[in-house]
């Protein structure tokens, strides 16, 4: 009897193109699709399909994004490309497209431009861990020294924002020529794919991380104790594990004495599953929605943090008027709203609907958070903005 063919599922990695308008992000996306499907198989997406980005809504925010997929021998990639600068800002802040790494496209005819800098800053703020540079339009530059100069400028700019500018891969190519099928430029796309495979480490799967479950509901079951319910965000909780209840009140410790899913008793609850966790020695009134259940010591509660936020435009159902310092909205983290005050950067007097801005937020109650956590800004239950924790202050 023939053995079944063993097919290991390839690691899945999320990437995207970033960079200044008209530097060739969409052309590069099409070139990657074209060259990799030609070399390794798969379904090709052409420039027009990618450029015609469908509209999506993430937390009420309208974002135009193109998603394509491609394979290298080692991995499966999901790649996002956005048509407009505003779409990038919204995408990165809301985390609609979480990137394990980004391809920064810089036209060698221009060098780094204002949005090049802004996208690098955003990548730093929202926690994009790795950047690979694709210097585009190199077929249009005859002067070798000029290319070296642009590469040096890009590397310095990345170092300025704490990326390893001296060490990260820079590929000099031409997306258009590769798309037109010229072998020497197609080779550069394969070089880029090789850099993606080797420079961006395999992302940690949600299940391998430290256990955390945002609490949505609390019940007490006569004779058994208190049960908290929610969807496991990452990790695994097993019967007998020690856990901490973090946020809003003082952190308390407990032990998981049972895991339930669809009224069935289980030994464990895993990332992505909705389950109830029975807690030893915890009263119903000790726990509330908005806290998290977590592996001991894995996450801590904080009240003050620096953030990067996007304010919804009027058309997106946001505010019709600007806000000023002293603005006190609610910040919605995971499952609950907490009121907070804002501090605007030096020289910024007001923030208009449709803007993005860095601000420091101080909450009236501590929330379990780490850098990279997304939140919504709400006024009376209506979303008026989206943000991400860039740095914890206190």
Curated annotation (Swiss-Prot):
UniProt entry keywords in alphabetical sequence: Cytoplasm, Elongation factor, GTP-binding, Hydrolase, Magnesium, Metal-binding, Nucleotide-binding, Protein biosynthesis
Region (G1): 19-26
Keyword Repeat: no
Reaction(s) catalysed (UniProt annotation): GTP + H2O = GDP + phosphate + H(+)
Superkingdom of this protein's organism: Bacteria
Region span, G5: 174-176
Recorded GO MF terms: GTP binding; GTPase activity; guanosine tetraphosphate binding; translation elongation factor activity
Chain sites annotated for binding Mg(2+): 26
Entry's localization field: Cytoplasm
Signal peptide, first to last residue: none
InterPro entries: EF-Tu_GTP-bd, EF-Tu_GTPase, EFTu-like_2, EFTU_2, G_TR_CS, P-loop_NTPase, Small_GTP-bd, T_Tr_GTP-bd_dom
Classification via CDD domains: EF_Tu, EFTU_II, EFTU_III
Region (G4): 136-139
Region ranges (G2): 60-64
Gene3D superfamilies: P-loop containing nucleotide triphosphate hydrolases, Translation factors
Spans annotated as G3: 81-84
Domain tr-type G: 10-204
Enzyme Commission designation: 3.6.5.3
Family listed: Belongs to the TRAFAC class translation factor GTPase superfamily. Classic translation factor GTPase family. EF-Tu/EF-1A subfamily.
Biological role stated in the UniProt entry: GTP hydrolase that promotes the GTP-dependent binding of aminoacyl-tRNA to the A-site of ribosomes during protein biosynthesis.
Record text on subunit structure and interactions: Monomer.
Name the UniProt record assigns to this protein: Elongation factor Tu
Name of the gene encoding the protein in the UniProt record: tuf1
